Amino acid sequence: MTKRKKLRTSGEGLCPPKPLKNPRLGDFYGDPQSSMLGCLHHPEEPEGKLGPVPSTQQHGEEPGKAVSSSPDEETGSPCRLLRQPEKEPAPLPPSQNSFGRFVPQFAKSRKTVTRKEEMKDEDRGSGAFSLETIAESSAQSPGCQLLVETLGVPLQEATELGDPTQADSARPEQSSQSPVQAVPGSGDSQPDDPPDRGTGLSASQRASQDHLSEQGADDSKPETDRVPGDGGQKEHLPSIDSEGEKPDRGAPQEGGAQRTAGAGLPGGPQEEGDGVPCTPASAPTSGPAPGLGPASWCLEPGSVAQGSPDPQQTPSRMGREGEGTHSSLGCSSLGMVVIADLSTDPTELEERALEVAGPDGQASAISPASPRRKAADGGHRRALPGCTSLTGETTGESGEAGQDGKPPGDVLVGPTASLALAPGSGESMMGAGDSGHASPDTGPCVNQKQEPGPAQEEAELGGQNLERDLEGFRVSPQASVVLEHREIADDPLQEPGAQQGIPDTTSELAGQRDHLPHSADQGTWADSLAVELDFLLDSQIQDALDASDFEAPPEQLFPSGNKPGPCWPGPSSHANGDPVAVAKAQPRTFVGIQASEASRMEDATNVVRGLIVELSNLNRLIMGTHRDLEAFKRLNYRKTKLGGKAPLPYPSKGPGNIPRGDPPWREL
């Protein structure tokens, strides 16, 4: 009895108390208070409650239609991301222990109030697009850092424009909405993220996008919704009627937010601004990478970002494009394949050339008549080696900001030399600074001075068949000769004026080849000479041992005059040079080779002679010793045989007693 009473008193009994069902209903299906405060509580205590809940609200709710009054349910705020690891199915709610005992969870009011204030501050300041986040993300990529420094003030102004619509879109009336079937609020043109997706857009992102979508409501391009749950990822999809399109320069343009879904998600059409048409790629687009963050930037090969030529739209375009592009964390996750060069020096831009190496190992310069071979004064972009399959789709308008005073006709295609390369097409674009500073073309090969960069080294190492003179490679003479031979063989349209910087060493090399003897003739002469010398040493080795002043015959080492001897064949029939030059070149080479061979032969002769003398001395010593030993044994045997003529009855065991038969020295 005492043990059972102790269990009842301590609450460790097997039977749970009666008020257990109401908290469990609230924990699993979520009453208004728990759904509103669950996101604001500590992540480890999402099911805690501030006070008792009326039983009418808990029993009257159905499992699939619980009322959700939390703005985080609709907007997918970062607090919802914190609750994502807690959504794993558990057999018991956290309000019960392993024995089934009810453990009341008390919320912490101070943390709740603090988190509410933090959420309000984030909503007011649009924390998702704050400059701090951009600076933090741009610290990892130099290209984004330059753009952030240029677009700092307009970006902050553009983010503040989204505050008026934020309160209406972030806190709509949701008394009759369920967490599974979420209806978009007033002023919201996009479907909300379902509650089971933890990577939805935050309230500040949705508010800013709603404000931008209202500005681009009268857009002539087809507008569609964004696929929910893409985690804020953006990607340009090829449109049907946007191939070869250029923005209308006469009509005022309002660039909407570039808001498209990942290519791998179903129902992901496109919503884009007037001044940002997309060029369709020749290959299917790839979906967003699964390992990237919620705000990563998806790049698509083959899409060209073309800015609006109207200079009046520059500040607003800078804000919107910077907000949609450079606030994402894709600059650090994907490495931002294309780096924007913001230098505005015309002389520097005139000296630089742009080169993109295709993944198939081929690249060619676009003809001057191509409309895409135009560049603004804002700079150009350089493709990094090894990353050409992912072409950067940055639409920074920093270059256009410096052209407010210029007429729209100066900007032909875009603010910066936007490049795109479809995989397998083998076509690259070249921007040479401002349209007024376009380099003159002398055919497919253009001689421009540029220091060899990493992209050029990549092209050279990969053995790509491109115009080397376009980049003005300055390499060693041998490499330049090889490149020149390739250009002559592969490019018949080459003009002589385009290669003034490269020295003409082809004719010199051909002359040197003509002066040199043929390789086959050299091999034959060397083999015959070696055979003759070997035969001489083998046949006259005995004479060399006898004669101390042995020397090779002078006729063999040095033939008389310049006439080719038996070891040296006549001039090669393949030589097309001057016979006099060939005759002059042959004796020099012959004499040099013979001198080296003679010195080596002399040294070898002395060594061989010394070795033979040593071997002969050793042989004499060995034979003399053997003879002395044999004579000593014979003498000893004779003495023993003469001394023992009389037969002894018992032979002595001394050393003189040798049994008859073969002597022991013959057995040696």
Swiss-Prot record:
It is found in: Chromosome. GO terms for cellular component: chromosome. The modification Phosphoserine is found at residue 370. Residues 1-142, 155-333, 349-465, 482-521, 642-668 are annotated as: Disordered. The keyword Phosphoprotein applies. Keywords: Chromosome, Meiosis, Phosphoprotein. Residues 114-125, 208-251 have a biased composition (Basic and acidic residues). Residues 279-296, 391-400 have a biased composition (Low complexity). Residues 166-180, 305-316 have a biased composition (Polar residues). Meiotic recombination factor component of recombination bridges involved in meiotic double-strand break repair. Modulates the localization of recombinases DMC1:RAD51 to meiotic double-strand break (DSB) sites through the interaction with and stabilization of the BRCA2:HSF2BP complex during meiotic recombination. Indispensable for the DSB repair, homologous synapsis, and crossover formation that are needed for progression past metaphase I, is essential for spermatogenesis and male fertility. This is Break repair meiotic recombinase recruitment factor 1. The gene is BRME1.
